[in-house]
Amino acid sequence: MAESHLDPSKLATGPAGFGAAAGQRPLAPLNAKIEVKNLNFFYNQFHALKNINLSIPEGKVTAFIGPSGCGKSTLLRTFNKMYALYPEQRAEGEIVMDGENLLQSKLDISLLRARIGMVFQKPTPFPMSIYDNIAFGVKMFERLTRSEMDDRVEWALTKAALWNEVKDKLSQSGYGLSGGQQQRLCIARGIAIRPEVLLLDEPCSALDPISTGRIEELIAELKSDYTVVIVTHNMQQAARCSDYTAYMYLGELIEFGETEKIFIKPARKETEDYITGRFG
């Protein structure tokens, strides 16, 4: 793939304050849940993210799109510091939530990931019962009675549109569920601890079209309670599910704005070329 020769000063910003050119600090919208300021990320010496400035709106679904290797999953994983286990990986800049720079925060990693939950590309149920898959994380942060835990498990499975399918087999292994059910189980597990933000990294890539449709319907419902950020290679999915879309290329944020505007009338030719299939 050819090297990018983009002029950062001409990056499109979308709605006022939601994005900014590299090296500039954006004005934070009043309802920003996460503010990314001059973020750079490195895998050893490889510069994977370059001066990212972005504000994630609260109570909305934001999609990251772009070709493979553009940095969208890397950006997603900086929000809850998934890189912290790997000393050769490092982030510089600011990721601010509730006035606190999460990159410099002394906040316990487990507590951070309770506030910012994550669902991965492939379903990852724990090797335990459906019930215990949901209860496991809750027990780490709350002391609930059995009755309270029963209510929480039912609540999470209901929110994930799975309760009616599993309510009579809660003691059975999560491995016995279909792929789509397992992914909804993982979403239920993620929201059971009541996070503020839910990160979804290609949550439908391994699923059939019917299961994908159910997950997309679920995403639309979840934004009433959570700020949702999704990485997807499926541009149609981004168009269907998200309120805001960020297009990335070679570690740079090229364009960010309301999804309808990004897909119907993008401000950058690079974005248009990618969305229309002329590139990527």
Swiss-Prot record:
Domain ABC transporter positions: 34-275
Biological process terms in GO annotation: phosphate ion transmembrane transport
An MF annotation (GO) of this entry: ATP hydrolysis activity
Organism of provenance: Burkholderia mallei (strain ATCC 23344)
Protein name: Phosphate import ATP-binding protein PstB
Protein location: Cell inner membrane
InterPro entries linked: AAA+_ATPase, ABC_transporter-like_ATP-bd, ABC_transporter-like_CS, P-loop_NTPase, PstB-like
Membrane topology recorded in Swiss-Prot or TrEMBL: Peripheral membrane protein
Subunit record text: The complex is composed of two ATP-binding proteins (PstB), two transmembrane proteins (PstC and PstA) and a solute-binding protein (PstS).
Gene name of the encoded protein: pstB
Coiled-coil portions: none
Family: Belongs to the ABC transporter superfamily. Phosphate importer (TC 3.A.1.7) family.
EC number: 7.3.2.1
UniProt keyword annotation of Ion transport present: no
Record-listed ATP binding positions: 66-73
This protein's UniProt keywords: ATP-binding, Cell inner membrane, Cell membrane, Membrane, Nucleotide-binding, Phosphate transport, Translocase, Transport
A Pfam family recorded for this sequence: ABC_tran
Root EC class: translocase
SMART domains from the UniProt entry: AAA (SM00382)
Reactions this protein catalyses: phosphate(out) + ATP + H2O = ADP + 2 phosphate(in) + H(+)
GO cellular component: plasma membrane
Function: Part of the ABC transporter complex PstSACB involved in phosphate import. Responsible for energy coupling to the transport system.
